[in-house]
């Protein structure tokens, strides 16, 4: 069932991120820009210049599979940039451009009407568990036009193609090829964004979920120094694997792919067709809490990002960071049929000696619902941040660590109680504000079409807040509630209508019972929800 649950999460993200088609109210106007590799011809529609599918690195195929990204080759003449490039290989999700190993491209959106003064740049890194997603799922036209900024979205290698580490691979980039792709795209941006009207000195990296994890990793990566001036982390933490963990995971994949002999595994894997590797990679990419992650203890990530943040060894840039209020509620659905006894057994299995204290704070009886166990266990998971540190108390602590060194740190919680969702859930189940539910408020997606007038008002406000941060390293902007820094003792509660407001940080701490969680010792969740539910005896249907 874990595959089914993970597939539901990935499919939800894919559905959420189905970009709308280019508006047709204005005829596209062709235009040409010169890059360091050659000229590209994009098109203008509805006030936004769009340049799509521009290669920023050489195709990582053949002997370049599992190598750091190499420079793209120059081209003669003018290259068409009116269609998205291929998505990086992943399990099929939804519609869109085809998939290919030759996928290292990016997209640039810039306002048609602009002055000669270079514009700030928002550099977007997509989520999807480092296993799915693509830059084309995020149409940057709306954010670019509304804020008079440039938006860049990218593809990077995913799954076994982006995060494999096995003995025999060159230590340069092993396990972190996707992260190195992101850095290569940032270097392309530094070299070329001026030709598109952007300011290379004012690049803000931003991402959600795995994209947010990536932002934290880039903040911790010495080779990324100087490539950006600000950062936005949405529902992302700072997780990573050790080299030993990554190579063990890689060896399991090599065995599944029929390349178990250590001395020959790399040559064997490189000789495999990409589709065979993709088929063999389900164990590598699948499973909540068991998917690929960046690898630390290597030159591009000498320290685990969480350690780098805690000790201050990061690129000290302004930061906007936050999460949704109910990050993991939908991931707790394996407990939909759980009884009180099964819920309590699961908490005991996961938290051991701390279980009684936790159950006193999260009693089954607090939820008068057929889904009481799901609501109770998701609440304690949210508040304790046991899923990669997402949301809750560890997330507030992470923000405090950033803010201790960077005064321009801004914290939020997406608090819309009923955002649109395309996820399939049981009748009567309240998803709250789950993981990724804020995306349709910032980018034009399928869920964007379902926003109520009050939610649309929040969407407009969020687009403006994010744009203000990209432009000024401060999200406060005229006509909206002021957003003080975290150092002022406040965070922003994002609500529909005009109800968004800055609240005291103690409100967040009380909401998530942080006095309790900060008083006990516990580890992150090590058992995925399906397995934990099965161990507790919860029926599957």
Predicted segments with their positions:
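Non-catalytic accessory segments of hydrolases
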Residues: 27-176, 448-462, 473-479, 500, ...
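Active-site loop->helix "elbow" adjoining a glycine-rich segment at hydrolase catalytic centers
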Residues: 127, 177-181, 209-212
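Alpha/beta-hydrolase active-site loop
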Residues: 103, 173-194, 245, 251-252
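Secretory targeting and sorting signals
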Residues: 2-26
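Alpha/beta-hydrolase fold nucleophile elbow
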Residues: 196-208
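Substrate-access "cap/lid" subdomains that shape
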Residues: 92-94, 191, 225, 234-349, ...
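Mobile gating loops/cap/lid regions near enzyme active sites that modulate substrate access
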Residues: 392-541
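Short glycine-enriched nucleophile-adjacent loop
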Residues: 212-224
């Amino acid at each position: 069932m874990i595959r089914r649950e993970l597939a539901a999460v990935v499919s939800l993200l894919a559905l959420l991120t189905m970009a709308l088609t280019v508006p047709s109210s204005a005829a596209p106007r062709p235009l040409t820009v010169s890059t360091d590799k050659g000229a590209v011809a994009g098109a203008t529609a509805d006030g936004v210049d769009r340049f799509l599918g521009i290669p920023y690195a050489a195709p990582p195929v053949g002997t370049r599979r599992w190598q750091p990204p190499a420079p793209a080759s120059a081209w003669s003449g003018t290259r068409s940039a009116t269609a998205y490039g291929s998505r990086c290989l992943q399990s099929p999700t939804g519609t869109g451009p085809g998939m290919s190993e030759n996928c290292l491209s990016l997209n640039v959106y810039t306002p048609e009407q602009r002055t000669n003064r270079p514009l700030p740049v928002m550099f977007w890194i997509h989520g999807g568990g480092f296993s799915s997603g693509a830059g084309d799922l995020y149409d940057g036209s709306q954010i670019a036009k509304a804020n008079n900024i440039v938006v860049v979205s990218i593809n990077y290698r995913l799954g076994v193609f982006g995060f494999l580490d096995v003995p025999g691979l060159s230590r340069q980039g092993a396990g972190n090829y996707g992260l190195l792709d992101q850095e290569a795209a940032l270097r392309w941006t530094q070299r070329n964004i001026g030709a598109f009207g952007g300011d290379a000195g004012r690049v803000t990296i931003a991402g959600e979920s795995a994209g947010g994890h990536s932002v934290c990793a880039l903040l911790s990566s010495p080779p990324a120094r100087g490539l950006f001036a600000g950062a936005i982390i949405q529902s992302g933490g700072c997780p990573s694997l050790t080299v030993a963990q990554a190579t063990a995971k890689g060896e399991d994949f090599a065995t599944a792919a029929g390349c178990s002999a250590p001395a020959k595994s790399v040559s064997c894997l490189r000789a495999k067709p990409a589709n065979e590797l993709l088929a063999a990679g389900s164990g590598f990419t699948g499973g909540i809490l068991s998917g690929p992650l960046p690898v630390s203890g290597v030159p591009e990530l000498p320290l685990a990002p969480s350690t780098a943040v805690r000790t201050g060894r990061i690129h000290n840039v302004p930061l906007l960071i936050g999460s949704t209020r109910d990050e993991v509620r939908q991931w707790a659905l394996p407990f939909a049929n759980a009884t009180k006894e099964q819920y309590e057994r699961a908490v005991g299995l996961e938290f051991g000696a701390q279980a009684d204290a936790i159950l006193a704070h999260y009693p089954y009886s607090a939820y008068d619902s057929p889904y009481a166990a799901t609501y109770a266990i998701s609440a304690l998971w949210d508040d304790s941040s046991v899923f990669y540190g997402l949301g809750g108390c560890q997330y507030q602590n992470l923000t405090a660590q950033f803010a201790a060194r960077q005064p321009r740190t801004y914290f939020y919680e997406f608090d819309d109680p009923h955002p649109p969702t395309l996820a399939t859930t049981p009748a009567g189940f309240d998803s709250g504000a789950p993981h990724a539910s804020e995306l349709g408020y910032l980018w034009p997606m399928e869920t964007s079409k379902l926003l109520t007038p009050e939610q649309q008002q929040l969407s407009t406000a969020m687009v403006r807040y994010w744009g203000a941060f990209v432009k000024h390293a401060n999200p406060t902007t005229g006509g909206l509630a002021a957003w003080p820094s975290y150092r002022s003792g406040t965070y922003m509660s994002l609500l529909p209508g005009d109800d968004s407001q800055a609240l005291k940080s103690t409100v967040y701490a009380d909401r998530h019972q942080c006095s309790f969680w900060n008083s006990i010792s516990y580890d992150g969740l090590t058992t995925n929800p399906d397995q934990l539910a099965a161990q507790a005896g919860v029926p599957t249907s």
